[in-house]
Amino acid sequence: MVRVLLDTNTCIEIVRGRRQSITARIQQVGLDALSICSVVWAELLVGAHLSARGYEKEHARIIRFLALPQFPFDQKAAEHYARIRSHLQPLGQLIGERDMQIAAIARSRDLILVTHNTNELSRVPNLRIEDWEQS
């Protein structure tokens, strides 16, 4: 079975419910293929705390993601993170810190990262990415 890790921007689009392409891809791969990581969950929580709607309303919108498997930034991911950063930094092509952590989690677990941030994340070697907003 194909396993995917949802990036924060994809989770936000799922909550908004405005992207037919994302809904279609979820139906195609099945809910069992979806996962998030601790870094994505943290970013979603920050968004809930900063939301103009208020934390409680926004938290109620994102809580469904806790039903998905959630992968931590563990020792294996840390090794991948170190390799990613040490590859990108000398090239002057660093991407965001949390993006590198999310990429490391996906790569360390051989997951496809579903993101709309393909411009930056395509710089990460051996990271499989898909943009379901463009499907």
Task: Please identify what each model-predicted range represents.
Residues 7-8, 22, 44, 81, ...:
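Generic structural signal for small/hydrophobic residues in well-ordered secondary structure
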Residues 10-11, 40, 77, 119-120:
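Alpha-helix capping/helix-boundary segments
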Residues 2, 46, 68-114:
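Active-site neighborhoods of divalent-metal-dependent phosphate/nucleic-acid chemistry enzymes
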Residues 25, 80, 87, 120-123:
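Residue-level recognition of specific faces of alpha-helices
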Residues 1-3, 103, 107-135:
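Acidic, PIN/NYN-like endoribonuclease modules and their adjacent C-terminal/linker elements
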Residues 1-36, 46-63, 90, 135:
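Short, well-structured N-terminal submotif of metal-dependent ribonuclease cores
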